[in-house]
């Protein structure tokens, strides 16, 4: 059973909190499938080539079939000719969507949290709000924790906190309703508000 490091108001280690034991029993393959699906959904699908039916021209046979001494040809737009079509090239009408059901998404998040806790990279705090909305104040918090590449999960994301962290390259703030297994996995450390963590555990 992995533990969550609980921080006090000064962002110093105060205690530890146990994650539910079932999180450690989740098959890591669920996390793999979710991340694979998530990344597939981000694909821009812009690669596109023209096939024989798409290119212009080439309707007329360039020369007679026999008698010239050269290779026979039926069109100037075959894939072996310069300026011709592309054989079996990519099309931009392809759908990369990969279905992952709700239960699998849930299991993936549980496994991601378990993995972070096992690496001592999952932290909980009562509240993490930057009332001033200043990036300088947000950066001071991150420096005090000595963390790099941090995901911050808030129970209720307020605009001031979002503005404060938005311009920090090594931080990303997200509401608990928008957090997913990919985000938890891709960051080196996760700071989650106590209420947000309780909400995630309760849903499970």
Curated annotation (Swiss-Prot):
| Top-level division of the source organism's lineage | Bacteria
**Annotated spans, Disordered:** 49-75
Q: What GO biological process term is on the record, naming one?
A: translation
Q: Does the keyword Ribosomal protein apply?
A: yes
Record's keyword terms, sorted: Ribonucleoprotein, Ribosomal protein, RNA-binding, rRNA-binding
Single GO cellular component term: ribosome
Family per record: Belongs to the universal ribosomal protein uL4 family.
Q: According to its UniProt entry, what is the function of this protein?
A: One of the primary rRNA binding proteins, this protein initially binds near the 5'-end of the 23S rRNA. It is important during the early stages of 50S assembly. It makes multiple contacts with different domains of the 23S rRNA in the assembled 50S subunit and ribosome. Forms part of the polypeptide exit tunnel.
Which named protein is this?
Answer: Large ribosomal subunit protein uL4
* Organism of provenance: Campylobacter lari (strain RM2100 / D67 / ATCC BAA-1060)
